[in-house]
């Protein structure tokens, strides 16, 4: 496929299983075309609006922050919102962007709390947010082993709560990798990957040039310059500082992630290497005009819906990278509405509750198909 259809269309790719028919029928935001904010239609203006919103939203005061010490001396943290929810209320586990933390995810957290009323916990990786980097170890894509420590603590604190995963950009890669590695043993009931790059051995080499330069500078500042006190002198530090692209940065910093070679690093972190082992419902959101996680990545992996039975790929023509702003006077995130509706629909489908009306009308479908 070389185009994504008429302006503002949303294409849905999925196998019409009973679960996905019910879920798609229940997600009104997916049924209607995504119409970007009229004065922020293109990818650049969407990202400008995202930067403005991130810079002007009030900080979110989380209910609690748990700092977890890891076996090698490193530390990660959990930031909780909605701790007063009933013990059986579902919990959304948020995995942030490449440099993200609880504050950068605050609009998503607020929207999930407003739309769902569920508990939300953000998993902060090593050296992110206010966390110090206490050992010379970090990974651009995060660590599944570290995530398992966080999930074990979440399960300890809310043992009766169903867990739903939401990964954003780089966080989606970590989430998909964990889902694939764990297979049937995953603690997640369902998951959402928002703006993923898919194959991380290729995705970073496709980032549009102006954004590639910007992200490379950001990665150097966030991972290396900020933590020079612990990283300076270690293999990968000087090499990372001389990187000119995101792809170079990721590859040159592999020793700081604990790997002897670039090949070993990719074998242990690439989400698509294990994606076929995912056993829970998965929604994937992408925009065709995304300059960071480009549409070619999506089109090369539409076959995901054939190997992951309950997977659904939603591809919009507009929305840019992690933006998806709609509305005029007070623009909000279409993606956040979709995420909330999907989580509610899957939870309703997998944990049936008494209803006063019949089952939602199912959309007729046959085979893997696009729907606009």
For every predicted segment, state its role:
Residues 2-18, 156, 160-257:
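Alpha/beta-hydrolase-fold enzymes
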Residues 43-84, 325:
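N-terminal cap/lid segment of alpha/beta-hydrolase-fold proteins
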Residues 81-134, 153:
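Short, surface-exposed "cap/lid" segments of acyl-processing enzymes
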Residues 126-164:
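Catalytic nucleophile-loop/oxyanion-hole region of alpha/beta-hydrolase
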Residues 252-274:
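Active-site nucleophile elbow and catalytic-triad environment of alpha/beta-hydrolase enzymes
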Residues 278, 284-286:
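Short beta-strand/loop motif that positions the catalytic acidic residue
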Residues 288-293:
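Acidic catalytic loop of the alpha/beta-hydrolase fold
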Residues 319-332:
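Catalytic histidine-centered segment of alpha/beta-hydrolase-like enzymes
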